């Protein structure tokens, strides 16, 4: 149980930072007594905890967007005080979620196996760290969420799909795309949080249903241990969101970029020396 709780802590600490939580869980598994990959199922279910933190932290934004979208699209009647921008943002969350739903379904076997190679994780940690660094450095910071278009939503969605490979980082990829498109850091980060909700809940609930219906005796952690890790991820994740929103209002992503590159190089050295297995 302690191992699972530790991984839940790690999930909460890293999910929203552009450093890839799935890569950290995959790597940490190599150093724990139950050494090995915690698995895509464990990772997806614990991410439900961190997304619950998003729902609570952004509850007013989400409630406003959902109410405006439902009243306009389903009820066909605008509610007093609703904004066309909220309706549009609701559509952009849906549009931006399409790529990861399609690609996640098509590549689900690769997600469970091939994509979890530590060699691949180390390389993409470095490569996407450099990409995020360039995007953040030269991004124009002239757009906010009012500028979101269908093309930008799809671009964000394609970037999010890259995070199907551990090491890319969902937030890192979407933030980099936002900066490339000229969005301010706070706007890119906020949309990144909102965009992740459908994808993460969809993946997590699917894996949870599978885990309950098809018990896997080879799984390193039981459902009880996984649920415990999910609760820890929720608590820690909420604190990280609050900290990150304040941090990014005055700072750049450079500390995370340096960390990604250093960690990626460290993983390569550990693999090359035989200290850990891919």
Residue positions per predicted region:
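Multi-pass membrane proteins that catalyze or facilitate reactions on polyprenyl-/lipid-phosphate substrates
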Residues: 1-278
């Amino acid at each position: 149980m302690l191992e699972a709780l530790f991984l839940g802590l790690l999930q909460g600490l890293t999910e929203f930072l552009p450093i890839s939580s799935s890569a950290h869980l995959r790597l940490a598994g190599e150093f724990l007594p139950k050494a090995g990959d915690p698995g895509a199922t464990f990772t997806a279910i614990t991410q439900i905890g961190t997304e619950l933190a998003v729902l609570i932290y952004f509850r007013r934004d989400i409630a406003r967007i959902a109410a405006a979208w439902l009243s306009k699209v389903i009820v066909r009647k605008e509610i007093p005080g609703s904004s066309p921008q909220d309706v549009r943002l609701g559509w952009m969350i849906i549009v931006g979620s399409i790529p990861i739903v399609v690609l996640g379904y098509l590549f689900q076997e690769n997600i469970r196996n091939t994509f979890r190679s530590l060699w691949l994780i180390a390389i993409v940690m470095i490569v996407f760290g450099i990409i995020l660094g360039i995007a953040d450095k030269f991004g124009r910071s002239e757009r906010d969420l009012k500028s979101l278009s269908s093309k930008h939503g799809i671009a964000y969605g394609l970037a999010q799909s890259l995070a199907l490979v551990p090491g890319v980082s969902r937030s890192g990829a979407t933030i980099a795309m936002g900066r490339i498109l000229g969005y301010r850091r706070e706007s890119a980060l906020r949309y990144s949080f909102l965009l992740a909700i459908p994808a993460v809940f969809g993946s997590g609930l699917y894996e949870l249903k599978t885990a309950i219906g098809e018990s896997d005796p080879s799984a390193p952690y039981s459902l009880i241990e996984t649920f415990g890790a999910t609760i820890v991820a929720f608590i820690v994740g909420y604190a990280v969101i609050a900290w990150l929103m304040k941090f990014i209002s005055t700072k750049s992503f450079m500390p995370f970029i340096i960390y990604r590159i250093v960690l990626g190089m460290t993983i390569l050295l550990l693999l090359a020396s035989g200290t850990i297995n891919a």
